[in-house]
Design a protein with these regions (language model features):
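Catalytic center-proximal scaffold of phosphoryl-transfer enzymes
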Residues: 1-337
């Protein structure tokens, strides 16, 4: 188990190739593994952890807040995508998938997920959650790009500055612990009115649409107005525990981006599934363990084998128990006429 976990950590957490990981094991541990032996070890580990991965998937649908994102990922020469769904304590990574709504439905079924979905404005996320938060980092980047690409147009700079001011006011309200729920709603209404005024004042006329960058500017205004109408711009004000960006999911992708940029993506669909299982477990262990070390992982995983129940399956059972209705004996007695 120790060898398999060490090998998997080198490959999936440090983004080394299997050959590089074998070379390190040989150098530091005097352990020689053939390529086929390394492949068998990783396959065996993924098989052992499949039930834990399934528990992570089920818990994601029960989370109160989920941050999500997707990025390009090749399987052999086929263009696919990698997805990340992350909550406070758990992460599900999927590799070699399509970029469509079916992936979101698989992880966050409409009839199960009642939490807040934090995402960019990609089409599959629109009108998808009962409560949503669009990523302000993506929106601000678009405004920054306009401002820097067309410095000769002062309107773009002024628009960005006012948009940033409104966002910062929202962040200030988010952190204001003195506000009651009623106070937050009142402040939110004022902030939304201010935002509507901003969008109205900067609405492009036909002449401005024809100017350099005018189409992108008009598209950004339209996107902002739609997100406001969908009540997905300032959810973080009403729910201070929610971040205003999905940067947490983007950070989770750093190892994946490094592997992709060095052409170490998946060679087969089976390899993509193996990476999905092992990477999800490692990332979720990092979120739950005080310190992620080989010793702490081994202690946790050997405990799974000894007790027959993993940390994640135990957490899932607790969530299931918490969501069960109380038995009839614990329900309040009906009032007598």
């Amino acid at each position: 188990m120790e060898i398999a976990i060490t090998l998997a950590y080198l490959v999936y957490s440090l983004s080394l190739s299997i050959d590089q990981a074998r070379e390190l094991l040989k150098f530091f541990c005097h352990l020689e593994l053939s390529a086929s032996q390394a492949d068998l070890l990783l396959n065996h580990l993924a098989k052992l952890w499949k039930a834990e991965f399934d528990a992570l998937v089920e818990m994601m649908a029960l989370a109160t807040v989920v941050y999500m994102d997707e990025t390009g990922w090749k399987v052999s020469a086929k263009r696919c995508y990698a997805w990340v769904f992350t909550s406070l304590l758990h992460t599900v990574l999927l590799y070699g998938r399509k970029r469509d709504a079916a992936v979101v439905d698989e992880i966050l079924p409409r009839d199960v997920f009642q939490g807040i979905g934090v995402s960019d404005d990609y089409a599959v996320y629109r009108n998808r959650f009962s409560k949503g938060q669009k990523c302000w980092a993506h929106l601000l980047r678009k405004a920054i790009k306009l401002m820097l690409s067309y410095p000769e147009n002062p309107r773009y700079r002024k628009f960005f500055e006012e948009l940033l001011t409104v966002f910062r006011e929202g962040k200030r309200l988010q952190k204001d612990g003195r506000l009651s729920d009623t106070g937050r709603r009142r402040k939110l209404e004022e902030l939304e009115d201010r935002f509507r005024s901003l969008c109205s004042r900067f609405r492009p006329e036909e002449e401005q649409r024809q100017a350099p960058g005018g189409e992108d500017y008009a598209a950004l205004l339209k996107e902002l107005v739609r997100c406001l109408a969908d009540a997905e711009l300032f959810t973080f004000v009403l729910h201070p525990e929610v971040e205003a960006t999905n940067n947490v999911s983007e950070r989770t992708f750093r190892n994946s981006a490094q592997a992709r940029n060095t052409n170490r993506t998946s060679k087969t669909e089976a390899g993509a599934k193996r990476r999905s299982v092992i990477s999800s477990i490692f990332t979720s262990l990092r979120q739950n363990l005080k310190e992620l070390t080989l010793e702490s992982i081994l202690e946790e995983v050997t405990g799974w084998c000894r007790t027959g129940q993993s940390l994640f399956r135990r957490q899932l059972q607790e969530l299931r128990d918490a969501s069960k209705p109380p038995p009839d004996s614990e329900l309040p007695a009906p009032a007598l006429a």
